[in-house]
From Swiss-Prot:
The RNA gate region regulates mRNA cap recognition to prevent promiscuous mRNA-binding before assembly of eif3d into the full eukaryotic translation initiation factor 3 (eIF-3) complex. Residues 97-162, 584-612 are annotated as: Disordered. GO terms for biological process: cap-dependent translational initiation; formation of cytoplasmic translation initiation complex. One of its GO terms (molecular function) is translation initiation factor activity. Residues 122-131 have a biased composition (Gly residues). One of its GO terms (cellular component) is eukaryotic 43S preinitiation complex. The gene is eIF3-S7. Its main location: cytoplasm. This is Eukaryotic translation initiation factor 3 subunit D. Residues 289-303 are annotated as: RNA gate.
């Protein structure tokens, strides 16, 4: 059965759509309502589709170049493409070693010619070739041990801010700032050898048995209870007498060495200078840590532990001072039957009520002509004498280098290297203690010592700072050792002369030289005359309890020459009770020269000398 469809003009109607014509652009004239609230999402046909700021995507492995050069398109993880491995294409690969032609064998072995004959088994060649195959981790660890960095991401922690040796007060006026690059260029050549004015004290002879001490034949360090006098310049009775007839600049060898070697120092220190008329008196403050020996001051990573830690900078300095005092006395031939070398005058710091035994130290008062009317008078020290096979007498300066923890200090194991590679041990000490060794050398040169003898002292146990052993000794001539450590005495004299000239141009008063704790420079301050005297007046009645004690476990009552109060340490600090400047100056001026008091403050002593 069929049905016939009639096609008439009324059954099909075509309505043409309404077209919009945009005369000003290419897009539609208006946005339809169906697409009005849909957010716009850009895309590129060459990239995977993604969203703007899609933080839910997987993080890139290398953050260094993250979102730096990549496109923003295709960041969405929902559009990510994951490739599925097709195991049908897996096949074995022949990993057999390919035999190289004869002319290519040994092509990348390196130069082995210079590594032959370095011991049995050619150990030198193995070490030389292995150095070129260090991995990145090995290089990184080596750089960290050396304290160096190669990448910006491996920056070392910022250096620790050090404290100043004395707090700068608001009423101090800065006169001069001298940076180390300028000071290192100074020079004062042709300074003649010092001329002896007076010699005092008694010395013991060095025991040559300690020259045979080595790592296998070590000797324990003994505690020698003797008194060491650390008298400052204006408390020295000999200098007070010489200031009337000799020179116009007065100091001690330790003060001069600190100034001359200031360009090598990193820690803060200070020296008080007093100008009265045409005379300069260089002093150290009482009850300070000026006489303590620094440890690893110039190392790449100096000790930075705080508090009462065993390896804190202050405890290490106290330990080094304790070792030096005991070592310098243990290596001598001591005893009532042993002969001693006596100078013309006796030790000027031994009082009538001296109870303990005084250390073997002799004092040599010398003067130097620095030209332009500057004559320096200083007190220098000798530690011992040595009788040569020819019968000559040589004066010695004895010092000790101490090992505390080679792993923490990035140093060399003394017990492994000292007997076979002593030069490497000394070179490591020159890097870590450049300032201390330079000051010892300057002191030996100023005193005119014939030899400077170093002792290598290590802890018996790395975690015990109270027991030590002597591992060996080594001696040098001061001039030769100065050349080895690149110490220029012309530059040292130039630095001293520069500071003296600056102070001589100032008005009469008290000044302070301080090493900046965090910058390579020293500053000269103009300070009031009574700056460091108030503390001494408050502590006048209790010197026994307030005196500086270098080492806590070596307490022994010992009287000092300048202060009758007992100081329970082997290092007797000659700290005298401070008096009012006007009263002390008037008292000194009213008394005869031979009755002048010996216990006055630096200001009082200098003022009294100038008035007379």
């Amino acid at each position: 059965m069929s049905e016939t469809i009639a096609c008439t003009p009324e059954s099909v109607v075509f309505d043409a759509p309404q077209l919009q014509f945009n005369e000003e652009g290419w897009g539609p004239c208006e946005l339809p309502d169906a697409f009005r609230d849909i957010p716009y999402q850009p895309f590129s046909k060459s990239d995977r589709l993604g969203k703007i700021s899609d933080w839910t995507g997987t993080a890139q492995t290398d953050k260094k170049y993250s979102n730096k050069y990549n496109s923003q398109f295709g960041g969405g993880s929902q559009y990510a493409y994951y490739h599925e491995e097709d195991e049908t294409t897996f096949h074995l690969v022949d990993s057999a070693r390919v035999q190289k032609p004869p002319h290519q064998r040994g092509r990348f072995r390196g130069n082995m010619r210079g590594n032959r004959g370095r011991g049995r088994g050619n150990r030198g060649g193995v070490q030389g070739g292995g150095m070129t195959n260090l991995s990145k981790n090995a290089n990184k660890g080596r750089d960290q041990r050396r304290g160096t960095t190669r990448k910006w991401g491996n920056r070392m922690p910022p250096p620790k801010i050090r404290d100043a040796s004395v707090a700068v007060r608001p009423d101090w006026v800065t006169i001069e700032e001298m940076d180390f690059p300028r000071l290192s260029k100074l020079s004062l050549p042709s300074v003649k050898e010092g001329e002896d004015i007076s010699t005092c004290g008694t010395l013991e002879y060095y025991d040559k048995v300690y020259d045979r001490v080595n790592v296998k034949n070590e000797k324990p360090l003994q505690r020698v209870d003797r008194i060491f006098h650390t008298v400052t310049t204006t408390d020295d009775p000999i200098i007070r007498q010489l200031s009337k007839t000799h020179g116009n600049v007065y100091a001690t060898d330790s003060i001069l060495a600190t100034i001359m070697c200031c360009t090598r120092s990193n820690y803060s220190w200070d020296i008080v200078i007093e100008k009265i008329g045409d005379k300069l008196f260089m002093d150290k403050r009482d009850n300070t840590e000026f006489d303590l020996l620094t440890v690893n001051e110039t190392a790449i990573e100096p000790p930075q532990e705080d508090g009462n830690s065993l390896n804190s900078p202050r405890n290490l300095a106290i330990e080094a001072t304790f070792i030096n005092h005991n070592f310098s006395q243990q290596v001598l031939k001591s005893g009532e039957k042993e002969t001693k070398f006596k100078f013309e005058d006796a030790n000027p710091f031994i009082g009538d009520d001296e109870d303990g035994e005084v250390a073997s130290v002799a004092y040599r008062y010398r003067k130097w002509d620095l030209n332009n009317g500057i004559v320096l008078v200083a007190r220098c020290e000798h530690d011992a004498v040595l009788l040569t096979p020819q019968g000559d007498t040589q004066f010695l300066t004895i010092k000790a280098l101490n090992e505390w923890d080679s792993k923490v200090a990035n140093g060399v194991e003394w017990r492994q290297k000292l007997d076979t590679q002593r030069g490497a041990v000394l070179a490591n000490e020159l890097r870590n203690n450049s300032c201390k060794l330079a000051k010892w050398t300057v002191q030996a040169l100023l005193a005119g010592s014939d030899q400077i003898k170093f002792g290598y002292v290590s802890r018996a146990h790395v975690r015990d700072s109270s027991r030590h052993v002597i591992l060996g000794t080594q001696q040098f001539k001061p001039h030769e050792f100065a050349n080895q450590i690149n110490l220029s005495m012309d530059n040292a004299w130039g630095i001293l002369r520069c500071i003296i000239d600056i102070c001589m141009k100032q008005k009469d008063g008290k000044y302070l030289i301080m090493k900046d704790p965090n910058k390579p420079m020293i500053r000269l301050y103009d300070i009031p005359d009574h700056t460091f005297e108030s503390d001494g007046e408050e502590e006048e009645g209790d010197d026994e309890t307030s005196a500086f004690q270098p080492y806590s476990y070596t307490a022994k009552p010992a009287a000092t020459a300048a202060a009758p109060a007992a100081v329970p340490t082997p290092v007797a600090a000659a700290a005298a009770p401070a008096a009012a400047p006007a009263t002390a100056a008037a008292a000194v001026a009213a008394t005869p020269a031979e009755e002048a008091p010996k216990t006055t403050t630096p200001t009082s002593a200098a003022a009294a000398v100038a008035q007379k």
